[in-house]
């Protein structure tokens, strides 16, 4: 199998996924998954698509990710891995789609408006 490319995005994070046959090595920005992400919960979030199709140690994955924080990056990586797996084998698509791994979460930070302290918070109003 050749190398398969996919892209995942979430908030301001962009993850580029390079998936190939292997024995389950996942590296992010040339470091291991466990070193890059501090929390065990985030690591399981990244591995969810692989666990769903029971292919946790069939593919080597190289990931370049930039922008955002840990959670946004992890969700971008999860989307990218799910998209790459669908390219490898289209029969994975229904189970991944059912779990919501192929849905791009389009929520972004709302912009700050002039005349306000934040996006929605106003300055204190005094009637008199």
Curated annotation (Swiss-Prot):
GO molecular function: RNA binding; structural constituent of ribosome
Pfam (any one): Ribosomal_S9
Entry keyword Nucleotide-binding: no
Top-rank lineage group of the source organism: Bacteria
GO biological process, one term: translation
PANTHER family: RIBOSOMAL PROTEIN S9, SMALL RIBOSOMAL SUBUNIT PROTEIN US9M
Name of the protein in its database record: Small ribosomal subunit protein uS9
Organism: Amoebophilus asiaticus (strain 5a2)
Lineage: Bacteria, Pseudomonadati, Bacteroidota, Cytophagia, Cytophagales
